[in-house]
Amino acid sequence: MAPKAEKKPASKAPAEKKPAAKKTSSSVDPSKKRTKARKETYSSYIYKVLKQTHPDTGISQKSMSILNSFVNDIFERIATESSKLAAYNKKSTISAREIQTAVRLILPGELAKHAVSEGTRAVTKYSSSTQA
């Protein structure tokens, strides 16, 4: 391996620093507080499903966080798999068929069957509501 070349000082003089442009006080209103960035979660939907199935049961913040992570993970897996399926078939659009196939590939046995039937039911319900 060749030895590294010796570093030589730069021949050019460093660029002159320009004075920073001053901000006018009218551009920033001090009375307005900066809003916190909103983090979107599935918490409200998880809670609604919980109340449909077990009306008298609550859920801790830690459990809600775990379920939210689970939903995000499954969503990402299905999206990735359906994207691959669309690419294999040389299509630029992910359709319901790609989603359904991805669900069948990712989820095991009976769980996949139930997920596909619920998904089909949801798509049918949505389609009928948009046509009316």
Swiss-Prot record:
Locate the region Disordered: 1-39
**Which terms in the GO cellular component ontology are assigned?**
nucleosome; nucleus
> Residues involved in crosslink (Glycyl lysine isopeptide (Lys-Gly) (interchain with G-Cter in SUMO))?
K7, K8, K17, K18
How would you describe the post-translational modification of this protein?
Monoubiquitinated by the UBC2-BRE1 complex to form H2BK123ub1. H2BK123ub1 gives a specific tag for epigenetic transcriptional activation and is also prerequisite for H3K4me and H3K79me formation. H2BK123ub1 also modulates the formation of double-strand breaks during meiosis and is a prerequisite for DNA-damage checkpoint activation. Phosphorylated by STE20 to form H2BS10ph during progression through meiotic prophase. May be correlated with chromosome condensation.
Modified sites of kind N6-acetyllysine = K7, K8, K12, K17
What residue ranges are annotated as transmembrane?
none
Q: What is its main location?
A: nucleus
Keywords linked to the UniProt accession: Acetylation, Chromosome, DNA-binding, Isopeptide bond, Nucleosome core, Nucleus, Phosphoprotein, Ubl conjugation
UniProt signal peptide: none
Which location does the Swiss-Prot or TrEMBL entry give for the cross-link Glycyl lysine isopeptide (Lys-Gly) (interchain with G-Cter in ubiquitin)?
K125
Name the domain of life this protein comes from.
Eukaryota
What single Pfam family name could you report for this chain, choosing any that match?
A: Histone
Q: How does it assemble?
A: The nucleosome is a histone octamer containing two molecules each of H2A, H2B, H3 and H4 assembled in one H3-H4 heterotetramer and two H2A-H2B heterodimers. The octamer wraps approximately 147 bp of DNA.
Q: What does this protein do?
A: Core component of nucleosome. Nucleosomes wrap and compact DNA into chromatin, limiting DNA accessibility to the cellular machineries which require DNA as a template. Histones thereby play a central role in transcription regulation, DNA repair, DNA replication and chromosomal stability. DNA accessibility is regulated via a complex set of post-translational modifications of histones, also called histone code, and nucleosome remodeling.
- Tell me the protein's name: Histone H2B.2
User: Lineage from the top down?
Assistant: Eukaryota, Fungi, Dikarya, Ascomycota, Saccharomycotina
Q: Give the gene name.
A: HTB1
